[in-house]
Amino acid sequence: MNAELVGSQDKLMRVRNEYLDLMQAFLTGSIYRDFAQAPFGSNLFDSHRREHGLDWPSTAETMIGVKRLANLRALTESVIADNVPGDLIETGVWRGGACIFMRAILYANSVSDKSVWVADSFEGLPAGNTLQYPADAGSDFHTYSQLAVSLEEVKENFRAHGLLDAQVKFVKGWFKDSLPKAPIDRLALLRLDGD
């Protein structure tokens, strides 16, 4: 390879990495120190809590934290580099940030043969089933309005980043009803964040 081509590829890689680093900082709210809104604990921005996904950002699109997004990026890039067949899905998306990030990674790498599936009730969390899952006893997460994000709001979040396109597919409903019927042929990456 000639030096000019290598230099051009290095520059492209730097731009790709800077774009994805910026997306990660924006999607977590770290870039603008988005305060927390959880009904427990302090609502001040705490970089340690945000890094580890231990708070509920007030406006950021994901609450999974910087470390989990970095892991999701590494896994998605591995799927691309290793030519793993299949699509990507997250089950339980809140505001859609992790899915937006997966779509951004596909975009940054010019991948057009994979879809990002966005699966959620888009109504919040279901009430706990203590008969089937005794650990649900006392859980009141289904009562928190902060966790109920509509399908239209999630679509708007994709749209705001210029990433709402035909490669983004939505699966609406409670997982026990919606996922068995979802028209997904094959998955390369599955991120489970459902309750």
Positions of predicted regions on the chain:
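N-terminal pre-P-loop "Q-motif" helix
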Residues: 67-72
